[in-house]
Amino acid sequence: MTKPDFDDIFMELAVNLAKRSHCIKKHVGAVLTKETRIISIGYNGPPAGTHNCDVEFPEHGCARDSKGSCSLALHAEQNAILYAVKNNTAVEGSTLYVTLAPCLPCARIIFSMGISKVIYLFSYAEYKGIGSDEGVDFLKKFGVEVERYQKEIEVNDKLV
């Protein structure tokens, strides 16, 4: 039997974490690792102690800000980073596995926190219908290693 490599294990976990999201629009999961050890996990949704979108706004999702983004939700990357920092875990030099490429604001946080590598499953640009993955472009421009996960993986009972 062949053992799975850590990239496969961590991306599979990110995919499963995405299923925990209460967001009506998109489910995203993230795993933050350092030297093959998990240091934090996250998925998109409102901060703990606030309302879940699928419960509070089941027909249309949470309220939107002036740019059309959810006004309540934290992104999966933000949740993973915030939880690590809240628990005094250093994230500098870590690797982030995420099911959706980071948006530009998340990319700025990733870079600022010293995360050295990002592996993502789906393109944010394709999801949003925009020209490029601005977050990925930003990270690459400033020296963060970024790669798209290329192996087949099961997401919502389908191989992608």
Give the label of every model feature segment.
Residues 1-160:
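Zinc-dependent deaminase catalytic domain
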